[in-house]
């Protein structure tokens, strides 16, 4: 019985336990680092590794504390699960870079985890946005269809715009999902090329594999970010309660800065700014470039951890009536069934999505009947009435700015269903706004 009560009150002791474990890790890690500095002649490499370790010890507790708070207040799984996955990016990046800085010979293999998780983060951010929207607006496709046509941004402004509705929604999701496939695939190719000694990381030359993989990864990443930006532009008003701009910048800056600074460092090697004259304890100039990249990432992740603490805060999810066990919250963090389901859905619809053929368009694109016309066809009214009868999801309520945002249906949907009900009862209401277009 006492054991059961202890586990039920896990929210009270889990945070002090985490603090104690972190302090113990510092007690063990700091003497080992000092001993490492004393046993060898201190050089630039060792100093850089020690400084990066200091930033690592500052970064890890900030990120893990926010993750732990989300687990303690795990009240909205569909929103907090992708947030927790995004928050893990900072500890993974920081620890990976610190290990790679210490052991340059295995950097290519350790960095594989970082590069794969980068794509995973972008996918989960898209999942966070779509989960919020579909829970608050069960008829999300109808909302997008009712909006004005969104044109492409430069440099794709000459391309035909994506049809508003299901086509745009699935193409944006597919554009993000493709990066989660391309990035791990190119990472595996990089490992194979490294084993075959044809990778030559950091050397811009069309005779090696690294240059081609950088181009492929860059194009795939840019398109994924473009789809995210287009998705936000279309649904900017609906996403405003969760303040997505700060979250988008946190994800975008970490991913883009880490990628492009690697390209800039490689260019510095190419033009001779980083040369063989100053390799310090590193064996090659390419190893110097990789070490510099890892050192900078360790510093940047400290800043990213602070930014994540505020932009992905746990406070909107704190509720008085909290249920669930410690193990349920912890295991839910590693559950990837939602990713499997999403990939299956995209595979089933990929043909129709690419070709631009939605299953059904509730708002027909006609010159006499468009989104500015106040009369809907009978078939559109029927579709809207059916859609409005679907109960909203009970999860996904985001408590921000002192109130709880509850699931809603579109105003058009609600009005259409009300009009249908009034007609059936034989009651006609006078129009309260503009006269009906003939």
Swiss-Prot record:
Extract one GO molecular function annotation from the record.
Answer: transmembrane transporter activity
Taxonomic superkingdom: Eukaryota
Q: Where is this region: Disordered?
A: 358-438
Amino acid composition bias (Basic and acidic residues), ranges on this chain: 426-438
Membrane topology recorded in Swiss-Prot or TrEMBL? Multi-pass membrane protein
Q: Where is the composition biased (Low complexity)?
A: 374-390, 404-413
Which UniProt keywords are present, listed alphabetically?
Membrane, Transmembrane, Transmembrane helix
Q: Which GO terms describe its cellular component?
A: membrane
- Residue stretches spanning the membrane: 17-37, 48-68, 86-106, 176-196, 212-232, 254-274, 287-307
Localization terms from the record: Membrane
Task performed by this protein: Possible tumor suppressor which may play a role in cell growth.
The text of the family note is: Belongs to the TMEM184 family.
In Swiss-Prot or TrEMBL terms, this protein is called Transmembrane protein 184C
Q: Can you name the source organism?
A: Bos taurus
